[in-house]
Amino acid sequence: MAEVAASPAIARDLSNIRMQAWNLFVVGFLVLFLELACIRWFAAYVVFLQFFTNVALLASFLGMSCGCMAARQERDWLSYFPFIALGAVLIALAMFLAFHSWSGLVVDVGGQRSPQEVFFGTEYKDPDIARFVIPIEVIAALFFVLIALMFVGPGQVLGRAFDTYPNRVLGYTLNIGGSLAGIVAFSALAFLQAPAGLWFLIVCAAVGYLQYQAGSLDRVKVLALIMLVVGLSIPTVWLRGEHARHWSPYYLIDHDIGAGYIGVNGVAHQWILSFAAAGSPYSLIHLLNQHSGGAPFQDVLVIGAGSGNDVTHALKFGATRVDAVEIDPAIQQIGRQYHPDHPYQDPRVVPHLDDGRHFLRSTDQKFDLVAYALVDSLILHSGYANIRLESYLFTRQAFDDVRRVLKPDGIFVMYNFFRQDWIVQRIAAMAEAAFGCRPTVLSLPYEERVKDLPLNSFTMIIAGCNVRIADAFAKHKDFWLDSVPPRNLAIDGFTLRPETLAPDQTRNLQRIAPSAVDYGADTMFATDDWPFLYLRGRLIPDFTLRSMALLGVLGVGMVYLFLPKGRFALNSRMFFLGAAFMLLETKAVVQMAVLFGSTWLVNSAVFFTILILILLANLYVLKVQKVNLTWHYIGLVLILAAGALVPVEVFLTGGTLWRYGAPCLLALGPMLFAGVIFARSFRDAPQPDLAFGSNIAGSVVGGLAEQLSMLLGFQHLLLVALLFYLLSIWSPRARIAAT
């Protein structure tokens, strides 16, 4: 009779275990998918947050940590998710509208008049005449808290599932499986350029399912989830006149079809210009080459081809082949469809959807001209690393790659609105070091010396050892450029003398002449290990320090509020493992960006690989009951030490296996050892919810420590990770507890 009576209870237990197993998978999917969605959406609508996407990343980790710690609370935090999310969305949209419709509102990003770090697009409103100035640190702190609160509910579900599921490592494996599904699903939507409303429809479906499983789903919550999806869909379908919005894999793109304007994440990015009407600076390098006695460039490489302006001008001046490299498929498609000169339809153009640095490293072609065409991405490459999409184009090693693909008499040209003289000095110094010849620097409007550049100063840096252009300037002193491109075809800018022309013929002429640039042997180069072109020196900017302090205080406050009452119970081993692993992920992201490009696809592949390595580590711990942590720590320390001490330049030459395989091993190898250490430690932890919450809290600290890369470089950042791992050894069982 006892056995018969026990059967329903056993069946209920098995059913509950199966439900928790499925919940672990679903919440793994939800957290990863929601994290990526928040990074993309809030970067698009919160003014200038695209330069600080790690705020959304760290907030998601903090919220998950707090949720795990609240696993034993009676309050159901997932029920609050739609209301918190809707509030965060409405606040973001209100700020977006206020910033773009009220000239008196300015968001200050580190004082861009004399900055320690330059952020393109943040300086167009003058703080001196503004009525209301908000520091970016305040905005970052506000959304740090709001996004963190969004993740408390999913984190609580995760903690409760870990508490209930009998086999923790198997449960963690199921959770990682859900995360893998989440990254695949979001990557598929990014490839399809799906709108944000669809992202959050999937999020709300997952939240609704978890609420239904818990028996807490009611009409009010269903209505709130529907309102959230509708609220997130409305901004995507706002169309003013001929405006169209596209969610590319990198940005929210605002395209004014009639005006030819392209904005990304609320910041002006580029204009589509007809050769017949405007854009003479794009012709300048071709005119200088032609009138200094050079033959038209035959083979041209344009990196940052965008909508096609630079490609158009290369074709107009006789190029027989133009390789047009653009990283963003949506911007490239806009150029194909809407550029009035149809450059992408020309059979001489070979479009490449690729990262510029990866193309330079992988191509065997040789070029007469390599052009960096207004390369400024206006966004970070990843929330895991403080680098931008173009960071690895402007390093000393990248310029060596350019030199390799140039023909003996080839020219390398870079142009942009660089904002600060020290950026121009750094680029010019790196170019001279790479090519052995001093570059020619031109400024439009003309500046005798590159110093205190105005915001509208277009600077061109001509590198390489082709001396024709420099000799022509030495002979003629000036070059005259007409602002209407077709008119330049009929004049020689070197021999033209404006004083001999009628006033109406000189109205559109601009004087071009070399500008003096002050740099010396002590000028700091950007390198593949320290790829911070826009950072004035090896320093952490003041506003970044303020932000770190503010986020740190807010994070500690939230953890304190969500910890079980009456005690402080962080599992210190798990905490330090989380901090260290975050830095391993950072190193992996930047290493793969150098090797394979800074594309969204490479980024997705990196995180997919990391999750696979964690999965393999879990399977190992499931199979091997007695895991000796000592040997795994020794292996981890050795491979981390090798990664931190072996110079990255060692891998720049040699066979494919050496150039690609060895760096991948050093970047990804530690994660297998670290995964085994984590899985074994998690299996033996007395309280899985607090252990996992402590680990995620450590990830927040690791994310803040990533800012040390601006001081140390990414290679020596591994020493910080090594320190965290040593601290995890120091406290092997480790709970800091006080009753």
Question: For each predicted feature, which ranges?
Answer:
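Alpha-helical transmembrane segments of multi-pass membrane proteins
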Residues: 2-739
